[in-house]
Design a protein with these regions (language model features):
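Non-transmembrane, membrane-proximal soluble domains of secreted or membrane proteins
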Residues: 1-166
């Protein structure tokens, strides 16, 4: 499971399946200003604030799945190519198990996760520590610069070795 939450602007950025890759696991549109502050949770556990309504948008990139939290009486299919959703409001602080309630293949048994419902203060502390899409882009730009420097240095060293042997 992976999760994306709206950032400070309160709006999720738009996404497209064609944008999904290792550098953009959620497929967020790079040109959408609302996506820059989206909070990215690449973990099996999502934290939620108690007594706040939550709208879950579900999508799948491979096969049919089902996000199920028995204690919330919440169960919804995640269908490839379709966004499904439902609303709920967690009202009891605690930890709850997320299950995939749709047989989805050989890895089905491992499709477990968690929901941690927290007080407002704990949730705000947790959310402030999470990575945003803007942070992810910045990290990738730094890595690209470092890779270019390494490639340039390796090319220089390689040329130096070639000239040395002649």
């Amino acid at each position: 499971w992976q999760y994306r939450l709206p950032g400070e602007d309160g709006k999720l950025g738009t996404t497209q399946i064609i944008n999904i890759n290792d550098n953009n696991p959620f497929g967020i549109n790079l040109d959408d200003p609302y996506g820059k502050d989206d909070v990215l949770i690449q973990s099996d556990v999502i934290n939620l604030e108690t007594n706040q309504p939550v709208k879950i948008l579900l999508r799948s990139v491979d096969v049919l799945h089902n996000w199920y939290v028995p204690q919330f009486r919440a169960k919804m299919d995640a269908v490839p190519g379709i966004v499904t959703y439902y609303w709920f409001e967690p009202n009891k602080i605690g930890e709850y198990e997320v299950l995939c309630a749709e047989y989805c293949g050989v890895g089905h048994y491992a499709m477990r996760g968690g929901v941690e419902v927290q007080s407002t203060e704990d949730y705000k502390n947790w959310i402030s520590e999470q990575e945003t899409f803007k942070d992810l882009i910045a990290k990738q730009e730094i890595l690209e610069l470092e890779n270019k420097k390494l490639a340039k240095n390796n090319n220089f060293l390689l040329r130096k070795e070639i000239y040395k042997e002649e």
